[in-house]
Amino acid sequence: MVARRNKPKAPLVKHRFSGGDSHKPKPPPATKQPFSGVESHKPKTSPATKQKFSGVESHKPKTPPGKQRFSGAESRKPKTPPATKQKFSSLERSALYARREAANILRTVLRGDAERRAVASIKSLVLSPSVRNKRGTFALVCETLKYLTVIKDVLDIANVLNSKWKRQEPLVFIVCYDILFGKDTPSIGDAEKFLMRHKEALLSGLATLLVRKKVDSVDQLLGSKLTGHLKPRYVRVNTLKMDVDSAVQELEKHYTVQKDETVPDLLVLPPGSDLHAHRLVANGRIFLQGKASSMVAAALQPQAGWEVLDACSAPGNKTIHLAALMEGQGKIIACELNEERVKRLEHTIKLSGASNIEVCHGDFLGLNPKDPSFAKIRAILLDPSCSGSGTITDRLDHLLPSHSEDNNMNYDSMRLHKLAVFQKKALAHALSFPKVERVVYSTCSIYQIENEDVVSSVLPLASSLGFKLATPFPQWQRRGLPVFAGSEHLLRMDPVEDKEGFFIALFVRANKLDNPKSSELPDRVCRRRPKERTMQLHPYLCPKMFRAWSGTLHRLKTRFLLSRNGC
């Protein structure tokens, strides 16, 4: 056993001691290896040691691989062309950006439509400051939605999408529209190149679809979606920057212009007039705003120097109209909850040049009417979220997948009920501000549940607070549905006759107009105890405690009225 141990130890010890003695001379054999060049193992280690330690000699063999790498990169230029990128024209780049921007908007619209969730209209999304090519983006979104069912059927027949592009369906829909129905053939972009490789399969799928549907053209597949909706182009003059006559003179150089009979600062142009890129629109001298939207602020009739609250203000067209009607004087508090819509609101205010608007990023229902900062509010404009059923064509909602001939304007009853509950709360909250004299409630809906029913449910509370219904625009012929006494004061617009559906109700505090006697007020107000009698019944209450006690009773009474009316 000793012999066995000694035999392997001896060579190991020899190697260890020889290796230990060679700690100092180890570098010389490493340097001698490239010079000797005798043993086959030494030249294998020498290049590695040369590359690591010999700075000058190692760079010489390294440079050829480096050059080969750069030459390899040069050889890839025809495959991923940096040189061809420089040859892209500005039109190609603009089309590429427009397709991406259109895909983002299409994704938002389709997601909201699938979830039956209210989102901004296509026009509002396109007019966002982040969208550069507004005209091209708007056209792509509208045309893709028009042909969307056909595009989906063609993609199902062709079966060319993999998992990667199925996750980017909005962009695929946009590019497929350009390939199948567009004027320009897309040439740059990953999605464009992928679908162009399958162009023949897509065209073959379209031909197969026509045969299956037994039609001769794509127009027969689309049906009613091709029917146009001729509506005049309305333009509101921003009187903070320009007077109406000057705007008429400028626009008459290229268009036929008429002044609207209802709203003084509103102009009427022929249908199809495209003013998105007009100089007056770009510098905020005129705004593309519909007639119904312009009538809302005009119905409120705010006076110069007033403090006005715009409860749901984004995107801001009605807000800046209020500022123009007030001649830039007084103060407007623009309240908006959504952060993205606040940005749009601020951009609109900046473009208009209005300096008397203060943006409040928060929930209107969360505002305290007794807060000293709202003590001087004399007018409130309330245009809350609604179904938008009166502006389906204007919003282009008729292009969405959920819209059909059989289900035209047929909204979910549960969603309508939720909207109506919110609208009642918002209107009751607006009427509770102590110094407010005028309140306008408006919707772009045609449904009674959002219009007359909301007003009638809040009317007892409004009467107890001294409000009555007034008649905005007495010359207007179309009035509210005759479902309660006083509905003739309400204003309606018909989506067929007036090209858009709208509803306006105006509340005016009665004691600010004629100071009625106590016997003329509702019985609920007459039964209120006078303050002197209460102080006699409770002599131990100091005035401060009495005010707190009476305020509590007032809040309880308001809650009782709201609960009784289903708010």
Curated annotation (Swiss-Prot):
EC number: 2.1.1.-
The keyword Cell cycle is assigned to this record: no
Active site: 444 (nucleophile)
Knockout consequences: Reduced methylation of the C(5) position of cytosine 2268 (m5C2268) in 25S rRNA.
Any one of the GO BP annotations: rRNA processing
Pfam families noted in UniProt: Methyltr_RsmB-F (PF01189), NSUN5_fdxn-like (PF21148), NSUN5_N (PF21153)
Enzyme class, first EC level, given as a word: transferase
Family affiliation: Belongs to the class I-like SAM-binding methyltransferase superfamily. RsmB/NOP family.
The protein, known as: 25S rRNA (cytosine-C(5))-methyltransferase NSUN5
Species the sequence originates in: Arabidopsis thaliana
Lineage, uppermost ranks: Eukaryota, Viridiplantae, Streptophyta, Embryophyta, Tracheophyta
